[in-house]
């Protein structure tokens, strides 16, 4: 056996103890120990974890940062014993959003807008936004571009469950389609000729409305779309995403919003606006008013007119689409950007300050209040808790800033039941409690307390930050288990055990064929956009997680270069 392989096997055995358990309420103990170390009150109940008030902005950065962590750390925990029927709460919000869209459709259908000054202002913004959208995307739909960008997602459809959600299975199995979308499938089939076999399972009128876990207070409602509808929806979404780049809005990159939020917290010239249930509040009439007729017809043809609830009830949608639709994210980004830019134009404010990522909106502070008036007029509800127009705090796209300082909290989202869960939490404490690897001594005491609960060898095994949470993040140069081979470092990490699930070779071929077509012909697709593609599309099996963990090895991509050619390559020895 080669020396490297022998050493890897030896280390794998040393780190083999991964089945350990923790107390049920250890998440609360970790949080309260942190608060005690920083001298702030502990959390006494599950209700307090999710209902802690936003901290005062009239204090220093360090104090705010800790109090903000207290308000957020367990706010998204999914195991609080609150006795709330989270599914019922989700459906209540879903039906409320539908009622809101119905009222918006009626309001926007009125002919006389001039009776009220706000409505007159709203009408001006809508007409300006319509003109901007027309100029951006054109009057006619570029069906050729849409066809080149159509693809299946990796999720469930009305005919295929999540387990078989990979595109290769969807190409191999007949998929559902709605009656109005069927003509696009026929046209696509004629364009492909005999190269692909596009089969239909059922022609239907509805999608499936379901809930997925969100937090301890409520679930989240989404829709599972017919497979072929999703195929074309994603093509439309990709084209809209391309067009938005002409406004310097890149939906593949959150860093622009994050950077602008930092600048806004420092200079107070930009506001961050967040909307509640944004994707469930895009009414049909609003889309009809804003989009060119041909685009509107396409969007309505590809949507599902109805949704089937788990209890069998059928709901006729008042909104254009919901979470789960393939073009929802791009469409809402387009609408919010157009409205925001229109408000700026009418107020004679620089439109370049507008940046949008979904329902995360950044705009000049002077335009924030008029923009929120328009949003309320067209049926959206600003989330006042996450909207910041004045003061030293801003938040956007997962980054939180106070006077230009990163105060982003970390979250404990689920119970800590295994070694992998504890490593994730300890790494979160490390990232929150260090600056360039230098510890805040208050956070270090808590980190070291819970570090002792890990097996000894896992305490010593460290990997560089940026390589996931399969091991503790830290000073990797002292890791006794690292293996240096061909000027690269190999690190042992925890990975979830996976099993192979066979898939159709025919479906794999079609997936590879259409995927390569997209990467070859799209003029907008950059190298960074290709990272989400399956690297082995023709493999005859896929990996499925099992909930168990084992030791695997990752390779450090950093090339170890000798400092001088004369001295040669430095020798790196492993600790015994």
UniProtKB/Swiss-Prot annotation:
Catalytic activity of the protein: RNA(n) + a ribonucleoside 5'-triphosphate = RNA(n+1) + diphosphate
InterPro entries the record matches: DNA/RNA_pol_sf, RNA-dir_Rpol_cat_phage, RNArep_beta
SUPFAM superfamilies per UniProt: DNA/RNA polymerases
GO biological process: viral RNA genome replication
Annotated cofactor note: Binds 2 Mg(2+) per subunit, Ca(2+) is used in crystallization to prevent RNA polymerase activity.
Domain RdRp catalytic: 259-391
Keywords for this protein: Magnesium, Metal-binding, Nucleotide-binding, Nucleotidyltransferase, RNA-binding, RNA-directed RNA polymerase, Transferase, Viral RNA replication
CDD domains on file: ps-ssRNAv_Leviviridae_RdRp (cd23176)
UniProt GO molecular function: metal ion binding; nucleotide binding; RNA binding; RNA-directed RNA polymerase activity
EC number(s) per entry: 2.7.7.48
Highest taxon, organism lineage: Viruses
Cofactor(s) essential for the protein: Mg(2+)
Binding site for Mg(2+) 1: 274, 359-360
Binding-site list for Mg(2+) 2: 274, 359-360
Subunit composition and interactions: Homodimer; the replicase complex can dimerize. Part of the viral RNA-dependent RNA polymerase complex, the other subunits are the host ribosomal protein S1, EF-Tu and EF-Ts. S1 is needed for the initiation of genomic RNA (+)-strand replication.
Protein's job: This is the catalytic subunit of the viral RNA-dependent RNA polymerase complex. This complex is involved in viral RNA replication that produces (+)-stranded genomes via a complementary, (-)-stranded intermediate. Binds RNA cooperatively with the host ribosomal protein S1.
Protein's UniProt name: RNA-directed RNA polymerase subunit beta
Species in which this protein is naturally found: Enterobacteria phage SP
Phylogenetic lineage: Viruses, Riboviria, Orthornavirae, Lenarviricota, Leviviricetes
């Amino acid at each position: 056996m080669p020396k490297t392989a022998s050493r890897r096997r030896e280390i794998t055995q040393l780190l083999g103890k991964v089945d350990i358990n923790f107390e049920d309420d250890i998440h609360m103990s970790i949080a309260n120990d942190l608060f005690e170390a920083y001298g702030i009150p502990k959390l006494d109940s599950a209700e307090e974890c999710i209902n802690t008030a936003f901290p005062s902005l009239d204090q220093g950065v360090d104090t705010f940062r800790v109090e903000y962590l207290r308000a957020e750390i367990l706010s998204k925990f999914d195991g609080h014993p609150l006795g709330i029927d989270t599914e019922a709460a989700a459906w209540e919000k879903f039906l409320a959003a539908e009622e809101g869209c119905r009222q918006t459709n009626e309001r926007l259908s009125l002919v006389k807008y001039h009776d009220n000054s706000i409505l007159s202002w709203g009408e001006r913004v809508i007409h300006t936004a319509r003109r901007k959208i027309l100029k951006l995307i054109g009057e006619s739909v570029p069906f050729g571009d849409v066809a080149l960008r159509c693809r299946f997602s990796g999720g469930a459809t009305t005919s295929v469950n999540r387990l078989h959600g990979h595109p290769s299975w969807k190409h191999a199995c007949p998929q559902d389609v709605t009656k109005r979308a069927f003509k696009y499938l026929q046209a696509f089939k004629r364009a492909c000729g005999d190269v692909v076999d596009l089969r239909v399972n059922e022609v239907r009128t509805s999608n499936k409305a379901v809930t997925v876990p969100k937090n301890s207070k409520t679930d989240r409602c989404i829709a599972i779309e017919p497979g072929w509808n999703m195929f074309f929806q994603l093509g439309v979404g990709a084209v809209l995403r391309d067009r938005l780049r002409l406004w310097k809005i890149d939906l593949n990159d959150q860093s622009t919003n994050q950077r602008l939020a930092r600048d806004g917290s420092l200079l107070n010239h930009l506001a961050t606006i967040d909307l509640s249930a944004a994707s469930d509040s895009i009414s049909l009439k609003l889309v009809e008013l804003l989009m060119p007729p041909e685009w509107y017809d396409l969007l309505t043809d590809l949507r599902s007119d109805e949704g089937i609830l788990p209890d069998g009830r059928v709901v006729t949608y008042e909104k254009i689409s919901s979470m789960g639709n393939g073009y929802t994210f791009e469409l809402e980004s387009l609408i919010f950007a157009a409205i925001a830019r229109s408000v700026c134009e009418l107020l004679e404010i620089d439109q370049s300050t507008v940046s949008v990522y979904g329902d995360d909106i950044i705009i000049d502070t002077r335009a924030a209040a008029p923009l929120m008036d328009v949003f309320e007029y067209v049926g959206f509800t600003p989330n006042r808790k996450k909207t910041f127009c004045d003061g030293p705090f801003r938040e956007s796209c997962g980054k939180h800033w106070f006077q230009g300082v990163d105060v982003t909290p970390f979250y404990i989202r689920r119970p800590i039941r295994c070694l992998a869960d504890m490593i994730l939490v300890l790494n979160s404490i490390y990232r929150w409690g260090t600056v360039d690897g230098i510890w805040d001594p208050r956070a270090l005491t808590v980190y070291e307390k819970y570090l002792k609960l890990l097996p000894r060898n896992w305490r010593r095994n460290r990997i560089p930050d940026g390589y996931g949470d399969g091991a503790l993040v830290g000073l990797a140069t002292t890791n006794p288990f690292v293996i240096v081979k061909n000027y690269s470092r190999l690190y042992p990490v925890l990975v979830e055990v996976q099993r192979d699930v066979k898939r159709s070779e025919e479906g794999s071929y079609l997936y590879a064929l259409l995927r390569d077509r997209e990467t070859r012909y799209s003029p907008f697709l950059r190298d960074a956009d290709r990272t989400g593609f399956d690297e082995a599309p023709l493999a005859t099996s896929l990996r499925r997680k099992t909930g168990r963990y084992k030791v695997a090895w990752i390779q450090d991509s950093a090339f170890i270069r000798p400092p001088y050619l004369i001295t040669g390559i430095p020798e790196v020895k492993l600790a015994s």
